Curated annotation (Swiss-Prot):
It comes from the Eukaryota. InterPro entries: GPCR_Rhodpsn, GPCR_Rhodpsn_7TM, Olfact_rcpt. The chain crosses the membrane at residues 24-44, 53-73, 98-118, 132-152, 195-215, 236-256, 270-290. SUPFAM superfamilies: Family A G protein-coupled receptor-like (SSF81321). It comes from Homo sapiens (Human). Residues 45-52, 119-131, 216-235, 291-314 are cytoplasmic. Belongs to the G-protein coupled receptor 1 family. Gene3D superfamilies: Rhodopsin 7-helix transmembrane proteins. The keyword Heme does not apply. Glycans are attached at N3, N17, N153. The lineage of its organism: Eukaryota, Metazoa, Chordata, Craniata, Vertebrata. It is a multi-pass membrane protein. GO terms for cellular component: plasma membrane. This is Olfactory receptor 5B3. The keyword Cell membrane applies.
Amino acid sequence: MENKTEVTQFILLGLTNDSELQVPLFITFPFIYIITLVGNLGIIVLIFWDSCLHNPMYFFLSNLSLVDFCYSSAVTPIVMAGFLIEDKVISYNACAAQMYIFVAFATVENYLLASMAYDRYAAVCKPLHYTTTMTTTVCARLAIGSYLCGFLNASIHTGDTFSLSFCKSNEVHHFFCDIPAVMVLSCSDRHISELVLIYVVSFNIFIALLVILISYTFIFITILKMHSASVYQKPLSTCASHFIAVGIFYGTIIFMYLQPSSSHSMDTDKMAPVFYTMVIPMLNPLVYSLRNKEVKSAFKKVVEKAKLSVGWSV
């Protein structure tokens, strides 16, 4: 990547300059991050430890937890550090690295959500063919494809953004190096770069959402065809909670990325990324895993084993 700029560092202005909000936010964000770490890493360890959870659904869940942990960790610690130190300077290369990591794992999540929706479609709508449809090879290809798309997409957007010249202001009106917030600082013509951003993001979201919407449409139809209310009530509730989480993720990303930078009000737009960088990674373990009986059963086994170990040691 060729550095065509005179700017060697950026200044992150943070989420807010309101002194009254500094303490509440400083308390809230570490709390959210701790829940995110415990929830996502706990799910990964639990799925790895319990052989009963070694199936396609939990394979994708463990990858989703890993992705949530990675892209949340690329942003949240820097936000928390910003509350402690006045100097919120980030180097040019560190800014590019943060953008790359965040975009890569956010894109991976985009395609993992589509893979998970297809997996649920196969399980609910084609249960007799589920084991032959979602084979180990198919799951591995879907996961690897998600990661490849993520890293390719991150390369496109990071290269596209940092190929611009930054020769004026270096103050990023954001709490991390998000693409629109950095791109708006460019003193060169960014029209082509904005079109690349909009078209590539639109393509990624369209493909994933198409798979998700088609899968869940067939799932809802299949569930509603079930004659017993007690049978379809639980899967309907589960699918609804999944759909809400997916809606928040895509709604905030569409709001941020599918508009030209001239339409952005950075003070307003800082709130949407809070959801997809901090809130969604915290909620996903609760929505997708911790409400599941198999996960709860595996967790109880771990607790009972820990109690026995403590008992023997005493």
